[in-house]
Amino acid sequence: MSELSAARELDEIAHTASEGWMIAGLIGGAIVGAALIAVTGGTAAVAVAAVVAGASAGGGLGEVLGSMSWAPRHVTGVLADGSPNVYINGRPAIRAHISTGECSEDGPAKKVVAQGSAKVYINDFPAARINDLLACSAEIHTGSPNVIIGGEKEQTDDIEPEIPDWVNWTLLAAGAGAAAVLATPAIAILGTLGGLGGGFAGSLIGGAFFGEGSDGQKWSMLAGGFVGGFAGGKGGAKFDAWRNTKIVEPPPRVTTKVDPISPPRMTLAEAVGQEQAKVWTQTARANAEKNNAQLSTLLTDDQIGAIYGYTTNEGYTALNPALRGQTPLTPELEAFTGHVTDGLNKLPAYNGETYRGTTLPAHILEQNQIGGTVSDGGFMSTSAKTPFDGDVSISVRGNSGKQIDFLSKYKNEAEVLYPPNTRFEVINRIEQNGTTHLLYREIP
């Protein structure tokens, strides 16, 4: 688990050296390519290709090296819009998704803080720390000298890469084209694919061993790219040798069977009907804007409408029996469930004990013994205030529940909803005055 200095208003933000080192690599690589041609000679096409290949390789290498932790950073602004009521060292604390940074490198508009702690929340949003990123890829450069916040990184907003994707794809295409001129198309294609595959594999291995975003991961990616590119180039050379000696006969005509493409998930309107979806979405959006406008912005129309629809009698009485295998789980109900689950995943976790009142079949109640593990195939509704009616009273301690009363049809229920198949350990069981009292603790 990462432990990093807490971020506050006016703490500095900085960009890496990726852009500057990429430009330096482009220039340096082009010079090296030109020098090689000057020494060895070559046609005009070969000379141009050598310069392009050198520039592409140098630019890509410079971009990666510039992002290393030891590469210099340059300060581009400060953090702003901290918490109105939580202070660290006398300065407002910074929260992901709400707080911003004033970055001189990315125009006059403020950039939202896009990462924070997955364990520590301030005003219901992840607490930001040093090294967390803003939406423009600037990182928080300075922080509190004595307040440390733990937890892995949680991303709340999209992050634009420091080097746009089109630039990297252009470098890749230019390098592959230059390789085709300098060598052969087969060597260029297989070498490029080998480099991409090796780099991807190296990134996965390095991320697992050294951590995501670490220098070790980046070195592993570079090494994998070089090894994969070399192996692919050798494979291309062998292919060229085989092609030049093989007698090629016209292939027989064959009929290729094309598997149908799986259709995308239904919209909420397709799943429950256009009018029903419209009513749910409009009502939920109005409730959310009134009760918690910030959370409202996290959800799409299909997600907010589906969560609201679940809270109605028509919603949960249709979904839960199907999820528990008691009624058919139709494609429409699968889509409905997917939109509810996607929406819950975007909401902050509820911290605290919740309660549930219910009536369980005898064979299910019998499974609820101390030390046992239980789960519900459907969504599990609990309340942050008082349990619902029933001869079984359950107290729940977990961290996967999401409070949805800000959009619910029944706000007074203070509903906290757990996703299907959440696993709990039965910590205690007491029989008292005809009521069974159970204590659940979520299993991570």
Curated annotation (Swiss-Prot):
InterPro entries: ADP-ribosyltransferase_ARG, ART, PAAR_motif
Keyword tRNA-binding: no
Chain spans, region PAAR domain: 72-140
E.C. number(s) listed in UniProt: 2.4.2.31
Domain of life: Bacteria
Catalytic reaction annotation: L-arginyl-[protein] + NAD(+) = N(omega)-(ADP-D-ribosyl)-L-arginyl-[protein] + nicotinamide + H(+)
Primary localization: secreted
CC per GO annotation: extracellular region; host cell cytoplasm
Knockout mutant characteristics: A double tre1-tri1 deletion is outcompeted by wild-type cells, but not by wild-type cells missing a type 6 secretion system (T6SS).
Domain TR mART core: start-end pairs: 266-444
Catalytic residue list: R356, S381, E415
UniProt KW keywords: Glycosyltransferase, Host cytoplasm, Nucleotidyltransferase, Secreted, Toxin, Transferase, Virulence
This protein's record includes keyword Transferase: yes
An example Gene Ontology molecular-function term: nucleotidyltransferase activity
Locations listed in the record: Secreted; Host cytoplasm
Region entry ART domain, spans: 274-444
Subunit relationships: Forms a stable complex with cognate immunity protein Tri1-Sp.
Domain remark text: The ART domain is toxic when expressed as a protein fragment.
Entries under PANTHER family matching the protein: ADP-RIBOSYLTRANSFERASE, SECRETED EXOENZYME S
Similarity-based family: Belongs to the Arg-specific ADP-ribosyltransferase family.
Functional description taken from the UniProt entry: Toxic component of a contact-dependent interbacterial competition system (also called effector-immunity systems). Acts by ADP-ribosylating a number of target proteins in target cells; E.coli target proteins include FtsZ, EFTu, RNase E, Fis, RL9, SucB, and LolD. FtsZ is thought to be the physiologically relevant target as it is ADP-ribosylated on a critical residue. ADP-ribosylation of FtsZ prevents formation of the FtsZ mid-cell ring and inhibits cell division. Overexpression of the whole Tre1 protein or the ART domain in E.coli is toxic; cells elongate dramatically and some undergo lysis.
The protein, known as: NAD(+)--protein-arginine ADP-ribosyltransferase Tre1
